[in-house]
Protein backbone atom coordinates (compact mmCIF):
# COMPACT_ATOMS: atom_id res chain seq x y z
CA UNK A 1 0.00 0.00 0.00
CA UNK A 2 1.41 3.39 -1.02
CA UNK A 3 1.13 6.44 1.22
CA UNK A 4 1.86 9.98 0.07
CA UNK A 5 2.80 12.46 2.80
CA UNK A 6 1.94 16.15 2.43
CA UNK A 7 3.36 18.56 5.02
CA UNK A 8 1.54 21.90 4.96
CA UNK A 9 2.83 25.38 5.73
CA UNK A 10 0.42 28.30 6.11
CA UNK A 11 1.54 31.56 4.48
CA UNK A 12 0.00 35.01 4.53
CA UNK A 13 0.23 35.53 0.77
CA UNK A 14 0.54 32.81 -1.87
CA UNK A 15 2.51 34.93 -4.38
CA UNK A 16 5.22 36.07 -1.96
CA UNK A 17 5.22 32.67 -0.25
CA UNK A 18 5.68 30.91 -3.56
CA UNK A 19 8.55 33.25 -4.48
CA UNK A 20 10.38 32.53 -1.21
CA UNK A 21 9.84 28.75 -1.35
CA UNK A 22 10.93 28.59 -5.00
CA UNK A 23 14.20 30.17 -3.91
CA UNK A 24 14.37 27.93 -0.83
CA UNK A 25 13.82 24.66 -2.74
CA UNK A 26 15.64 25.89 -5.86
CA UNK A 27 12.74 24.91 -8.09
CA UNK A 28 9.26 25.82 -9.15
CA UNK A 29 6.45 23.86 -7.53
CA UNK A 30 5.86 20.32 -8.77
CA UNK A 31 2.22 21.29 -9.18
CA UNK A 32 -0.36 23.94 -8.32
CA UNK A 33 -3.60 22.29 -7.19
CA UNK A 34 -5.47 25.61 -7.07
CA UNK A 35 -4.89 29.38 -6.71
CA UNK A 36 -4.14 29.15 -2.97
CA UNK A 37 -1.60 26.29 -2.87
CA UNK A 38 1.79 25.32 -4.29
CA UNK A 39 3.37 21.88 -3.84
CA UNK A 40 7.05 20.80 -3.96
CA UNK A 41 8.08 17.15 -4.14
CA UNK A 42 10.98 16.64 -1.70
CA UNK A 43 11.24 12.86 -2.11
CA UNK A 44 9.31 9.96 -3.51
CA UNK A 45 5.76 10.23 -2.12
CA UNK A 46 6.85 13.19 0.09
CA UNK A 47 5.65 16.72 -0.48
CA UNK A 48 5.80 20.13 1.19
CA UNK A 49 3.04 22.52 0.29
CA UNK A 50 2.25 26.10 1.12
CA UNK A 51 -1.30 27.34 1.43
CA UNK A 52 -2.60 30.88 1.71
CA UNK A 53 -4.10 30.88 5.22
CA UNK A 54 -3.26 34.33 6.61
CA UNK A 55 -4.77 33.74 10.05
CA UNK A 56 -2.55 30.67 10.51
CA UNK A 57 0.64 32.00 8.89
CA UNK A 58 3.76 31.91 11.03
CA UNK A 59 2.74 28.93 13.17
CA UNK A 60 3.93 26.03 10.99
CA UNK A 61 6.89 23.73 11.64
CA UNK A 62 8.26 21.23 9.17
CA UNK A 63 11.39 19.08 9.55
CA UNK A 64 12.95 17.00 6.80
CA UNK A 65 15.35 14.34 8.09
CA UNK A 66 17.92 13.77 5.33
CA UNK A 67 21.00 11.65 4.71
CA UNK A 68 23.09 14.57 3.37
CA UNK A 69 22.45 17.65 5.48
CA UNK A 70 25.07 19.81 3.79
CA UNK A 71 23.78 18.72 0.39
CA UNK A 72 20.42 20.27 1.26
CA UNK A 73 21.51 23.27 3.34
CA UNK A 74 24.50 24.59 1.35
CA UNK A 75 22.54 25.23 -1.88
CA UNK A 76 19.87 27.11 0.08
CA UNK A 77 22.56 29.33 1.62
CA UNK A 78 24.09 29.89 -1.84
CA UNK A 79 20.66 31.08 -2.99
CA UNK A 80 20.78 33.78 -0.32
CA UNK A 81 18.74 32.30 2.53
CA UNK A 82 20.64 32.00 5.80
CA UNK A 83 19.67 29.56 8.55
CA UNK A 84 18.14 30.99 11.68
CA UNK A 85 19.77 28.33 13.85
CA UNK A 86 22.31 25.50 13.59
CA UNK A 87 22.51 22.90 16.34
CA UNK A 88 24.39 19.69 17.05
CA UNK A 89 22.84 17.59 19.80
CA UNK A 90 24.78 15.51 22.32
CA UNK A 91 24.01 12.38 20.31
CA UNK A 92 25.58 13.91 17.18
CA UNK A 93 22.34 14.68 15.35
CA UNK A 94 22.61 17.96 13.45
CA UNK A 95 19.64 20.28 12.99
CA UNK A 96 19.41 23.42 10.83
CA UNK A 97 16.39 25.72 11.00
CA UNK A 98 15.28 28.32 8.46
CA UNK A 99 12.39 30.76 8.89
CA UNK A 100 10.28 32.01 6.03
CA UNK A 101 9.09 35.65 5.90
CA UNK A 102 5.97 34.72 7.92
CA UNK A 103 8.06 33.11 10.66
CA UNK A 104 7.30 29.48 9.79
CA UNK A 105 10.12 27.06 10.65
CA UNK A 106 11.47 24.75 7.98
CA UNK A 107 14.25 22.53 9.32
CA UNK A 108 16.60 19.83 8.19
CA UNK A 109 18.03 17.17 10.45
CA UNK A 110 20.59 14.42 9.93
CA UNK A 111 21.99 11.50 11.88
CA UNK A 112 25.66 11.58 12.88
CA UNK A 113 28.10 10.47 10.18
CA UNK A 114 28.40 6.71 10.15
CA UNK A 115 25.15 6.16 12.05
Regions found by a protein language model. Name each.
Residues 1-18, 60-62, 112-115:
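N-terminal beta-strand motif that seeds the catalytic metal site of vicinal oxygen chelate
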Residues 1-3, 54-59, 89-90:
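Short glycine-enriched loop/turn motifs at secondary-structure junctions
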Residues 27-60, 105-111:
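Conserved short beta-strand elements that form part of the metal-binding/catalytic scaffold
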Residues 78-115:
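Vicinal oxygen chelate
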Residues 24-30, 80-82:
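Conserved acetyl-CoA-binding loop of GNAT-fold acetyltransferases
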Residues 70-75:
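Short amphipathic alpha-helices within nucleic acid-binding modules
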Residues 17-22, 76, 103:
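Conserved active-site tyrosine of GNAT-family acetyltransferases
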Residues 8, 39, 47, 63, ...:
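Short hydrophobic/aromatic beta-strand element in the GNAT-like acyltransferase core
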